[in-house]
Amino acid sequence: MLVIYAKLEISARDRVEIEDIRQRFDRLQGRVEPHFTLVFPFAGVPLDDVLDHARSIAAGVAPIPFRLAGVAAVPDPLSPAAHLFLLPDEGDQTISDLHDRLYSGVLARNLHPTAVYLPHVTVGRFERYEDAKTAAASLPAVDIPGRLSVMTIGDFDGEGVEDLHNVRLGAP
């Protein structure tokens, strides 16, 4: 399945902080870098069409500064599982707008009709919401500034992601 995401451009110190959390709580740690998912895994659209669409959208979007400042336990809307998210308090609306623009054109039919997008970096996955809440309460506050300047189209197999194409934001 294809997926579109943006890897975090952050300091080495902040990357270690995120990876330490992920090592404790995220089974995909080490298989995909910390990122914002912009288009969730999907099938049925040819890669060339996805690449053309992503390039078209990216050309009109400048690199996005953000700041991760919140930690939240969030129930999975499609299962009994839950996630541990780092949430931005800066850049979140711009990331949401990019997500919305990507889910147009050839990708419009892949938007889940009841899904509400919350920009986030996943740092934990849990079978039960209560476990995610406990993990969130155990973490110190975060303050991680960064930037997104590249979207990556990847091939997600359920266990990890293989990068296929990078698309630079703001590139004609």
Describe the function of each predicted region:
Residues M1-P172:
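Histidine-dependent nucleotide/RNA phosphoesterase domain, centered on the 2H-phosphoesterase fold
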